[in-house]
A protein has these predicted regions:
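Conserved acidic residues
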Residues: 163, 228, 257
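A conserved beta-strand element that flanks and buttresses the S-adenosyl-L-methionine
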Residues: 231
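A short glycine-rich, Lys/Arg-flanked "PGG" loop and its adjoining helix->strand segment in the class I
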Residues: 245-257
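Short catalytic micro-motifs in class I SAM-dependent methyltransferases
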Residues: 234-238
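Class I (Rossmann-like) S-adenosyl-L-methionine-dependent methyltransferase catalytic domain
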Residues: 2-221, 239-246, 260-331
Length: 331
């Protein structure tokens, strides 16, 4: 490994090891980043399901994305301190096929989703769970787990030979814990790795029988094409441009079929915007330049801007992160 990458590795490891294991275990799994309602995490699970059952569950996938939009809109209302009565008024308006209540405009994607569901449905539950006098309590877990239950039931009797899967920068099993909870994990021979030993200890405590390792994305200790597919989230923005290119080369080297990549800080511009923050980076990446890098190694690179995707598919213009992207890479 080049000396500059060794130094960057040390800085990255130090930046994460400064945090406690409890904080790391809860990182990126709450609020709008909760993988049950985060669109990038949902699309990643759909990517995995399509690897083993291509096209089989398209309608369910569409409804799960709609579910995420409904819950995220509800979270926005709760942040604005709506009351339990106001939430019930929203449900009454939906039942009466109205698009506003007491001056609160109900987005069309909410109305369309409600109309597509039989009664009673999860929207009825979501907008009646809170006590009349307050909405301070969090949304109930059983409601957030709506599609976890759906997928577990749908996949329960499915069979498939395990597909080898790699996740660099796995954190404290941030996404894997939901891949497992949704009944998807058993179709994959999974390996997750991270630079931060505390993350790996957290992951192993949750999943003692799974393969979680301390490894370095700049030098992956695996043969060429060792894994059928790979997914990785929120990694490349934190690397220097040179290190990022090395990491991409390594991930592509060890992956045989397809890669799903989530970005949190990307834009439709010509050049990367490099921003060093303390001992690591918080870069704004160019979608076009990143696509070109992956096309050096792959047969096809699909770029999905989450904001544009949700607007064109569902008419939703209320995403929380305009810089969120997903790349689907076919090797």
């Amino acid at each position: 490994m080049e000396e500059s990458f060794e130094l960057e590795t040390q800085a990255l490891r130090k930046s994460w090891m400064q945090y406690g294991r409890t904080l790391l275990r809860g990182y990126l799994v709450r609020g709008v980043q909760d993988p049950r309602i985060n669109v990038q995490s949902i699309l990643t699970r759909h990517f995995l399901i399509d690897r083993v059952f291509p096209g089989q569950f398209a309608l369910v996938m569409d409804q799960e994305l709609r579910f995420s939009l409904v819950v995220n809109w509800l979270l926005k209302l709760l942040k604005a301190s709506v009351t339990g009565d106001q939430l019930r008024a929203v449900l009454d308006a939906l039942l009466d096929d109205e698009n506003n209540t007491d001056g609160l405009q109900i987005p069309q994607f909410i109305s369309q989703t409600f109309a597509s569901l039989a009664l009673p449905n999860y929207i009825c539950d979501l907008f009646t769970w809170a006590p009349v006098e307050t909405t301070d309590a969090p949304i109930q877990e059983y409601l957030l787990n709506t599609f976890q239950a759906v997928w577990r039931e749908l996949l329960e009797n499915e069979r498939h030979q395990p597909v080898s899967l790699l996740e660099p920068a796995c954190g404290s099993a941030n996404d894997y814990r939901f891949i497992d909870a949704f009944g998807i994990a058993r179709f994959f021979d999974y390996t997750g790795f991270d630079l931060c030993e505390k993350n790996i200890r957290n992951a192993k405590r949750m999943f003692p029988d799974m393969r979680f390792e301390v490894r370095n994305v700049f030098e992956i200790d695996s043969p060429d094409k060792a894994f059928d597919c790979c997914f990785v989230h929120d990694l490349f923005e934190h690397l220097s441009i040179e290190a990022m290119q090395a990491a991409i080369a390594e991930i592509c080297r060890v992956t045989q079929q397809a890669i799903c990549i989530g970005f949190f800080n990307m834009y439709n511009g010509a050049e990367h915007i490099v921003k060093a923050v303390d001992s690591y980076h918080w870069n704004v990446l160019s979608a076009a330049r990143m696509k070109a890098v992956f096309e050096r190694y792959a047969s096809h690179a699909e770029v999905i801007h989450i904001d544009s995707f949700l607007l064109s598919r569902f008419g939703c213009d209320q995403t929380h992160n305009k810089g969120a992207y997903i790349f689907i890479i076919k090797m």
